Regions:
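N-terminal beta-loop-helix "entrance" segment that forms/cooperates
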Residues: 39-58, 159-160
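Helix-loop-strand module that forms the ligand-binding subsite of alpha/beta enzymes
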Residues: 56, 60-149
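Glycine-rich phosphate/pyrophosphate-binding loop and the adjoining helix
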Residues: 143-205
Length: 205
């Protein structure tokens, strides 16, 4: 089994990465492979709602970062963890630009696979950013993996998050819970839930 972790921080080895590595280390100890993709400081194209992904099977803007995620999902992932620093009470905008494209073009390949979000902040806004990231999972029938608390940790300068003992424990618990869910789903014999044909409601006729 394999879990993809996306580091949504421009600092490739900052606090968000440290939190994700704590999750990954726990997953590895549970015999689950992991891969971390960092967005770094790359400029990220946002979705322009052109609809071409529906025809191509991938976003028409095939930049290196999107391609890395696309390739990882196509090669097969069993779970997804998204990490972000908190900016003005929300996730990093570059990360959201990437996720909009990923979930619109590849969301069908992530259905019924466990997802989790991780946020790191200096002081406040973590729960709002956490909620924002979880919305990606809830539009794609993805079970959300929880921990002993909301998946957040605190730190300002790089490395400080390691001193947040509760935050790091929350990350380890998240890793164990993700592993537990993956293993249970792997042995499930009843397949996926029954789905209805999607119905859309527009509020203006």
């Amino acid at each position: 089994m394999r879990v993809l972790l996306i580091n949504g921080s421009p600092k490739e080895n900052g606090n968000t990465c440290l939190a994700l590595k704590e999750v990954a280390k726990t997953l590895n100890a549970e015999s689950i492979d992991t891969e971390i993709i960092s967005i770094g400081k790359q400029a990220v194209q946002g979705c322009i709602a052109c609809g071409w992904c529906g025809r191509l099977g991938k976003c028409t803007f095939n930049d290196d970062l999107y391609y890395k995620v696309w390739r990882a999902v196509k090669d097969g992932v069993d779970g997804l963890v998204i990490g972000s620093p908190v900016y003005y009470g929300g996730p990093n905008g570059s990360l959201c630009a990437l996720l909009d494209r990923v979930f619109y073009s590849l969301g069908h390949m992530l259905q019924y696979k466990p997802g989790a979000s991780v946020v790191v902040c200096r002081r406040g806004g973590a729960s709002a950013a956490f909620d924002r990231l979880n919305k990606y999972f809830t539009t794609m029938n993805m079970p959300i993996v929880s921990s002993q608390y909301w998946n957040m940790a605190y730190g300002h300068t790089s490395g400080q998050v390691a001193f947040d003992e509760e935050g790091m424990q929350t990350m380890r618990t998240l890793g164990h819970n993700m592993a537990w869910m993956l293993k249970r789903l792997n042995v499930a014999e009843d397949g996926h839930p029954q789905k209805e044909r999607p119905t859309w409601t527009n509020f203006i006729k």
